[in-house]
Regions:
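Substrate-recognition element of Asp-dependent hydrolases with the DxDx(T/V) motif
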Residues: 62-66, 71-103
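Active-site neighborhood of HAD-like aspartate-dependent phosphohydrolases
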Residues: 1-51, 146
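Acidic, Mg2+-coordinating phosphoryl-transfer loop and its flanking beta/alpha structural elements
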Residues: 130-167
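Short, basic/glycine-rich phosphate-binding loops at helix/coil junctions
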Residues: 43-58, 82-85
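Conserved Lys-Pro-Asp/Glu-containing loop-to-beta segment of HAD-superfamily phosphomonoesterases
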Residues: 114-140
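A short, structured active-site edge motif that brings together acidic residues
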Residues: 35, 86-93, 100-101, 108-124
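A structural signal for isolated positions on well-ordered beta-strands in alpha/beta enzyme cores
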Residues: 84-86, 128, 146
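Structural recognition of alpha->loop->beta junctions
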Residues: 102-118, 159-177
């Protein structure tokens, strides 16, 4: 299967680290649970959202990121099973290089030629899209959609959009295996 995996918050701890750095620099106490929508401007004051958005231009932030638990092993397992895996990101062009550096540092087994910078992921032809941004998942109706749970994507009923919610990489792998088994069963019954 062709699997498109979002980069930020699926492979790395971008939002968690960004909030941590913001809180230290500003002596604030913003929590991940305060981020109730994907767009910071819809859940934080404009001043705070502006300051957080500025952090995305700071190389120190990108250098401080780490893989989330299970991401490295999960990505390796998907590749080992023979899936065609692409990492997708809707990043600013100036951050793309830093993202490639991160992959080379932590996911050296991954071919960085398979990283796609794309703002509208509904344009991707894939069997599965793994994301934390509900807007991207809702727009892409032609594939199986897996949402990694975060506070900013809890504001819909997943079943309405046939989105599979997972809480960690083990659950993501289980869901991919389930989808693969269902596809194999369908192909077997429709030959």
């Amino acid at each position: 299967m062709i699997i498109a995996i979002d980069y930020d918050n699926i492979l790395n701890n971008l939002t968690e680290k960004t909030i941590e750095i913001y809180n230290k620099r500003n002596e604030k106490d913003i929590q991940m649970s305060d981020l109730t929508t994907y767009n910071f401007y819809n859940c934080l004051s404009k001043e705070i959202a502006d300051e957080i958005m500025e952090l995305f231009k700071d190389k120190k932030l990108w250098d401080s990121l780490a893989p989330i638990i299970g991401a490295k092993e999960g990505l390796q397992q998907l590749i080992d099973k023979g899936h065609r895996v692409y990492i997708t990101t809707s990043t600013a062009p100036e951050n793309f290089y830093w993202k490639i550096q991160f992959l080379n540092r932590y996911f050296s087994f991954f071919n960085t030629d398979n990283v796609i910078r794309i703002m509208d992921k509904s344009l991707l032809k894939c069997d599965i899209l793994i994301e934390d941004n509900l807007e991207q998942l809702i727009k892409h109706k032609l594939c199986h959609r897996i949402c990694l749970d975060y506070p900013w994507n809890r504001n819909i009923d997943d079943f309405i959009y046939d989105i599979h919610r997972c809480y960690n990489w083990n659950e993501i792998l289980d869901e991919v295996n389930k989808i693969e088994e269902e596809n194999e069963e369908w192909e077997k019954n429709n030959r």
